Amino acid sequence: MTLTASSSSRAVTNSPVVVALDYHNCDDALSFVDKIDPRDCRLKVGKEMFTLFGPQFVRELQQRGFDIFLDLKFHDIPNTAAHAVAAAADLGVWMVNVHASGGARMMTAAREALVPFGKDAPLLIAVTVLTSMEASDLADLGVTLSPADYAERLAALTQKCGLDGVVCSAQEAVRFKQVFGQEFKLVTPGIRPQGSEAGDQRRIMTPEQALAAGVDYMVIGRPVTQSVDPAQTLKAINASLQRSA
């Protein structure tokens, strides 16, 4: 992977890989991070780690050269969501997300909160349908649409509100690229190299399949974080993606 110029101290990578950090111990997380290269991936920090370790943990990762996807899935009244997104921008993260099911007014308020940050604003992404959810889960909530149809409806609302893209399953990516265009970014969890276990993600795909489907950023967790050689695993994934491009 190659580096491009950055106005910050952080490296910028053109790899589509985002490694999901899921650690209960800060030292263990940093020990893992120190084994990998910020030119090979970005990092995702979710609710558990951010609650445990706070903004300073994000700064520690940024000081090591990594761009951060702050995966907190804000879902609140418009004013509160807007302030939360602005706080994430102040922290200097690369990407932040909200729940599309929070509605148009909430998403619009979040987008408008980033206007003062200009080119330094993070990408603002909306979550459609969690990849662990199946049709039966949606039915329990009173949603009669299939996961794919419901995700597309929420993605259309997201684009209408002017956000940068959505989190979606890899299976939805092909249609979403056709419907919403190349500039609408698709972020996909549940990506696992061939031979990895499915874990708690129901709708999964390999990195090569995800790239072919139109995924812009692919989130990979345990296949990298639990690898005996995570640096080599990342390089192998990126090499396979370059061959597939």
Swiss-Prot record:
It is an enzyme of class 4 (lyase). PROSITE patterns: OMPDECASE (PS00156). The active site is at K73 (proton donor). One of its GO terms (molecular function) is orotidine-5'-phosphate decarboxylase activity. Belongs to the OMP decarboxylase family. Type 1 subfamily. Catalyzes the decarboxylation of orotidine 5'-monophosphate (OMP) to uridine 5'-monophosphate (UMP). This is Orotidine 5'-phosphate decarboxylase.
